[in-house]
Amino acid sequence: MAAAPLYCVCRQPYDVNRFMIECDICKDWFHGSCVQVVEHHAADIDVYHCPNCEPIHGPYMMKKHNNWHRHDYTEPNDGTRPVQAGTAVFVKELQARSFASGDILVQMQGNQVTKRFLEKEGFNYPIVVHDLDGLGLKLPPPSFSVSDVEHYVGANKVIDVIDVAKQADSKMKLGEFVKYYYQPERPKVLNVISLEFSDTRMSNLVVVPDIAQKMSWVENYWPDDSFFPKPFVQKYCLMGMKNSYTDFHIDFGGTSVWYHVLWGEKIFYLIKPTKANLALYEAWSSSPNQSEVFFGEKVDKCYKCVVKQGTTILLPTGWIHAVLTSQDSMAFGGNFLHNLNIDMQLRCYEMERRLKTPDLFKFPYFEAICWYVAKNLLETLKELRENKCEAQGFLVNGVKALISSLKMWLRRELTQPNSEVPDNIRPGHLIKALSKEIRHLEDDSNKAVKTQGSAECSLSRSTLEKGDQAQQAARRLQDHHHHRRRHHHHHHHHHHHHHHHHSRKLPSNLDVLELHTLEVLKRLEVGQLKEDSAFSSKVNGKFKKVCPVPAAAVEASHDNALRLVMCNGKIIRERMPITNVAATVNAVEMYHKHRIKLERIPMCPEEKVKKEKCEDEFGVQCTIKKPVSQGESVQTELRTESPHLASSDSDSKAGDSAEKCSLESESSDGEDGGSQRDSGTFVEHLNSHRHSHHKQALKRERPTSPNTDCAIQGMLSMAGLLCPQASGGAADILQQRWWASQGNGSSTSSSSDMWDSSEPCSAPRSPDAEDGSLGEEYSYRESSLSPPLHPSKRHAPNPTPVSNQATKGKRPKKGQATAKQRLGKILKMSRHKGLFLMKPMVFLIPQQGGTPLDPQFLLQSSSICVFPPPLIVSG
């Protein structure tokens, strides 16, 4: 094998990393360092004579300056060629131009520039910070000089130097640049803008701003065991001579920039990276006469920003900018990729590829870091979804753009072998996983939008119909503190969503009973119940909303306004002030005396919600017991339901817990007659006593006619309507009970398109609910806004049976109903979890009673029992 040719006076082979110059006489090549010719100076030599030829042919000859406005100053100055960027003439013209003021700059304090602020407000405009305090940036003192840079970095450090007049890049040692910088006369303007010193001793003198450190992809996502070398782009030292100029450009990879002028002055010419401006920039960059066209004139606005000594500027992603050094300056800066503008960063990178930008001016291993970022963002999205946190918009948009770029890079690898996919990453699997997470986010976002949209409609409905419940709760709370008052005042309740007041008057007990009676008569086809026009006008579709319970209702739940014991339709005990302990003692006494067994009802959260809600609204719960064969009995409610529900065998089993919690009733054809007669009796009574009870809550005094008033109170108790309702909304609230029970039946029922459904719940009752308070899981599930249908015309749901430990082994056999039934067929066990089957000789101890109950009442309590949610009595 032939030996490599030797060159230069040193007789060394060719070294690609060393600058060499050819002798025009002997045609031999010489190292610039061996013949004392620097690279940037060689371009000005017209004819070079090596040291061997110089004694014979004389010294080398330099080029003549024919013009001062062209990169090639040897061109004739005939005035026909335009001015090129960077030349002396260009700089003078640039300083004379007028630009838009830098009013787009965001003036901030150092402690205000935080990651949270940028994530919330966005990083779309340049930020100027005049004080270093709070920015986290540490730099050498302003007395730090170019020679100090040489001391910390090293004189032999090879750096890239730009000849400003020619806009040409060349390499030289740092020591040579420093020597040239301190010359009294500098024939050329040299600019150093790419001295990265992270691997030098000077790195210890500089600490990058906190915002750049916390947001940087390299610092946060680049693994230590990466096959690719870690990019160092965070610490640059820029040393520029006066009149140095860098033409318009976008920093590599669309990186953002932090820039601090240690001493001197810099002038930035800024252009916003709009789509139009980016398209113009790409066309301008690829044009052959790029240096002859000032890009600032091609866009709508170009802003001028003067950065003086001690000032820091942060440039966002993609901003097109040029820099003029108006005086000798030293500055420190750095570049960083981040999550805020992923889309723009990728667009800038693809633009660099289309423009065939040399690797020297591109972000090192840009594609590799994008793969690392994609892997980490996948984990971030998973955590957000698992924690049920909403992903920020910039992150979602960035991941979408990243997925598109990753797919494109994979396709490009089929034809281009230079892959930057890390070895420990499965690209196809990663892209699929990211796409899946994005789909989850979009699905959740669509659900959130629907929920938000329905919230407005539901809250509007709540304002008109359900807002009255908050009024009722407030009234009960006031009654508890002022129970000796004979009259109640009407109060305004401030709705916590809509922030406006309701001033509607509350109806009396007779009004409520009349509305309910008319409702029952309509279902029995005796009379028609007119739909509320205000409600019907708002029925536009189906909405779902889970509304929080008003605060007044929560407080009122701790002290239930009323506890009644009824027998044969008469109120035996009313509002007896006895504690829970006293009630328990009474229960024990009743157990020993009458062999009555007390049980506590385990309730799921949803059952507790509806149970306590009904209790807060109406004050009591009532059941109608009907003896059947063998002394067993079942319960029914005042309301009726479609007949075909009674024939379902599945309804006799343990039903859905959500349905059991609702207050719903069923009726049979054979019982319509009796119900009709009883209802008619109460309608007559309502018409005669309505005005005497108007605008009054439940009376605390002995009525004038005990038998009549007891009958009214009994019907109210059986209907669950003892608490006064708001005028105009009572009928709607009554109807809503049926909606809640119908909708909570089963998610697979045939009527699921019209009525809401909820998941069955079997969680035990919380301790807070046992003492009359509301648990944390208390929520009100608003029904669909579908128009209310007549109960006999609605389709019955097919509830899914749910096992309930409290009801196992206690279901009575179906038997013949008694002759004393009043308003409906027997209520099946599957329809009410909180109402249990009891024998005729059973009563309930009130939760807040007064004096112990007379055992004589046991002989009369054969049809009606009123009991609080926590306790039931069974024989």
From Swiss-Prot:
Q: Which residues bind substrate?
A: 246, 266
Q: Which GO terms describe its cellular component?
A: nucleus
Q: Where is the composition biased (Polar residues)?
A: 448-462
* Protein location: Nucleus
One Gene Ontology term from the biological process aspect of the record: chromatin remodeling
Co-factor remark:
Binds 1 Fe(2+) ion per subunit.
Map out region (Disordered) in residue numbers: 442-506, 629-710, 742-820
- Which cofactors does the annotated protein need, by name? Fe(2+)
Q: Where is the composition biased (Low complexity)?
A: 742-762
Q: Where is the composition biased (Basic residues)?
A: 478-505, 688-697
JmjC domain: which residues?
Answer: 197-353
Q: What is its EC number?
A: 1.14.11.-
Give the family this protein belongs to, as stated in its UniProt record.
Answer: Belongs to the JHDM1 histone demethylase family. JHDM1D subfamily.
**Domain remark from Swiss-Prot or TrEMBL:** The PHD-type zinc finger mediates the binding to H3K4me3. Binding to H3K4me3 prevents its access to H3K9me2.
This chain's protein is named Lysine-specific demethylase 7A
Recorded source organism is Danio rerio (Zebrafish)
- Give the gene name: kdm7a
